[in-house]
């Protein structure tokens, strides 16, 4: 399998996982329990995909926003608000480039800073989009942050867990090169001369 094929399969699997989990979370909150709150898996999934695939996570930012609003039966304005919010999250790539994925992964503080900055970017851009497209006042940014606080707590827990799973919260190109290097060392030790 080529690297491009691996990346494509991985990206597709993350879209499917997101779609299923988000659909179930939204239906649980709106249909099964009729509560106004729901925990979204969007933030941790975007953070994981960005860590794995850098700029390719923009595909997920767009698809996740579209699926989220679709599952909520949202309006056209909401589509734009969530698209803009998720594209705001993509500014996190600048942080990743400056700090490096290795430093982000290396410590709890690095991973949580990465997640929190992404969360704030997403919420601020959603708020700004709401101000521009729906005529909301600046308080809408605070509203977005507060309504998504449960999702942030959930995202923190997810990132704590995935940091401990080998190969999940890491740049995939680097990870595959490391695996290949380990394989060559192991195989090299067993070759007959």
Regions found by a protein language model. Give the residues of each.
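Membrane-helix interface "capping/anchor" motifs
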Residues: 48-62, 101-102
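Hydrophobic transmembrane alpha-helices
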Residues: 1-51
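Alpha-helical transmembrane segments and their membrane-interface exit regions
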Residues: 44-48, 68, 85-95
């Amino acid at each position: 399998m080529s690297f491009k094929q691996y990346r494509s399969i991985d990206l597709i699997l993350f879209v499917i996982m997101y779609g299923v989990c988000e659909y179930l979370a939204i239906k649980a909150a709106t249909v099964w329990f009729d509560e106004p709150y729901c925990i979204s898996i969007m933030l941790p999934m975007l953070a994981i995909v960005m860590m794995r695939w850098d700029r390719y996570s923009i595909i997920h930012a767009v698809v996740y926003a579209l699926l989220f609003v679709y599952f909520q039966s949202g309006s056209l304005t909401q589509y734009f608000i969530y698209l803009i919010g998720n594209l705001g999250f993509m500014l996190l790539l600048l942080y990743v480039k400056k700090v490096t994925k290795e430093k982000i992964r290396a410590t709890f503080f690095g991973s949580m800073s990465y997640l929190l900055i992404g969360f704030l970017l997403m919420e601020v851009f959603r708020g700004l989009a709401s101000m521009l497209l729906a005529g909301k006042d600046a308080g809408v940014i605070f509203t977005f942050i507060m309504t998504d606080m449960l999702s942030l707590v959930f995202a923190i827990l997810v990132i704590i867990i995935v940091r401990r799973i080998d190969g999940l919260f890491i740049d995939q190109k680097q990870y595959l090169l490391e695996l290949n290097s380990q394989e060559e060392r192991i195989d090299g030790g067993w070759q007959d001369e």
